[in-house]
Amino acid sequence: MLLASAPFTAMAQGQAGIKAENLDKSVRPADDFFTFATGGWQKLNPLPGAFSRFGSFDQLQENNNKRINTILTDLLKKQGKEGTTERKLGDFYKLAMDSVRRNKEGVSPVKPLLNEMENAKSLSDLRALQLKYASFGYGVPMGYSFEADEKNAKMNILLIYQDGLSLGQKEYYLDNDKATTDIRNAFRQFIANMFRLYGFSDAQAEAKRDAVMRYETMLALISKSRTELRDVEANYNKMTLAEFKEKYPNIPLEQLANAEGIKSEYIQTMVVCQPAFLAGVDKLTSTETAEELRARMEWNAILASANYLSDDVRAEYFNFFSKTMRGTKEDYPRWKRATQQVEKQMGEALGRIYCERYFPATSKKRMEDLIKNLEVSLAERIKAQDWMSEATKKAALEKLSTFYVKVGYPNKWKDLSQLTIDPSKSYYENVQTCQKFWAEDAIKEKAGKPVDKDKWLMTPQTVNAYYNPTTNEICFPAGILQYPFFDPKADDAFNYGAIGVVIGHEMTHGFDDQGRHYDKDGNMTDWWTEEDGKNFEARTGKYADFFSAIKVLPDLNANGKLTLGENLADHGGLEVAFNAFEKTPEAKKGKVIMGFTPEQRFFIAYAGVWANNITEAEIRSRVKSDPHSLGEWRVNGALPHINAWYKAFDVKEGDKLFIPENERLKLW
């Protein structure tokens, strides 16, 4: 995956490609290329109050939000025929926009559920409620879903994985630096405040808060870190249902699955991703009291409903998760939150209309041509590596040649005829209906069935891209095929430096520290010779060390192990895209535009993709959780290892970004 506003039409009418106002020519490119290429953009785009990070991605997403909101507003005005997808989109958007109704209802839509939990006095009563609401997982500290079997990638299998941490990462519960401790203390207060807002007394709120904190802290102790979760082989442990019951007798997996509509025959074999975590959960379950389980179930229900109730509840949620954790100053406006929620529940349906209105066929064709050129370039680079044997090269080239390429939008669209949106019910109740629909749909489509390679993992309007190892596919949604990633009016230097590197980035994921463990059919298998595998690990280990040495704040280093895959993909994307660009007629002509050679424009376009402003709190949050390096270091950390960049900008010894050639990292 590649991550984590003026309308594009207006941009396309003006100057194409690189924009002079986005640069800061007072900075030498050899000393700080990020500021040289994006300093002007940073000054022109100060951090908006509703963002903790605002960059080129976000600017484009803002434009998409406005487009999607226009679609929804039009649908609301037209009041389509009852039962049509268009009517459902409009009705759901209206519910999301109706804050007057939500404020009048307060927390009443979720009170029947909380009352059920509060009135369940015994463990058996509470566990019966867990089965009743199995689709929502209240109080269940593990996740499970049907996904491709990584060692038989054509078939889906039940995956069971660690879950249950409200803060996402274990470090928030266990680290003791001041920034983390402050967040943890604020989290404790937030839990109690939320229980009070939902009608519990001070004494109840504090007792339930303590129960939640105790349990989640114990979960943190047995959870793997984000870095440990990157080890694909260590996180694949196949077992039978009988073995699961023997190992984890206190976890009622079969009952939960059956309650959700999953037949036992479909879970006779499964993959347990983190066995030690489940062993810990099994032990915790054996000693848990009714009071503790009730508090956790209620907390899960509260957290899951907070964005769909009255403004005071949403404000409390925002104040902790956005303001405290990320440094955001103000919430998104109501229209934007409403638009995002419609996207979350019916995104593909919106995407179909989006593509009809905004995605030209010419963009799809040009993108497909670029991809073909970069596939040729990557093949050449694989063949040229002196550290790989011919056998491994052959397997790598076979994998590359079988990439399944997706551009723009899916070949088939999801049928939503069975999804019901009922305007007489609350916004929260309709969200629950949607969530249950998608949970049941996933079971119907995946349980006991082959993997559907035509299914997209992102909506067409998403500003991102991805590589999926189990289907060996690269996907570029329509949403990202716009400025500053792609400009049909710009020269090749711009498009190869921007979207070209994105394409190369996703291709390289097929051969990064995770992707290299999967063959051309998507199966996890070791297709490398032993020596080649060792060579790969030795080379990539240097990338991890290099990025871990970067200080992102005076008291905080980057995590090169967590970001390894993305850093490898950035490096590979740059090498592959530049190699392909050099073959273009425009590159060979060497025409100077705006005072820059084609090679210089290539690298400026690349850096422009990562232009951003960011809060300190967001930096700290991303270093803990994000497998991508910060934007500044995707430029200043990546380019000093690209020989062509030195030549393009005459970077020499003594310049701040200079690295001796024998110390530059190289893989592809």
Predicted regions mapped to residue ranges:
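Bacterial Sec-dependent N-terminal signal peptides
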Residues: 1-14
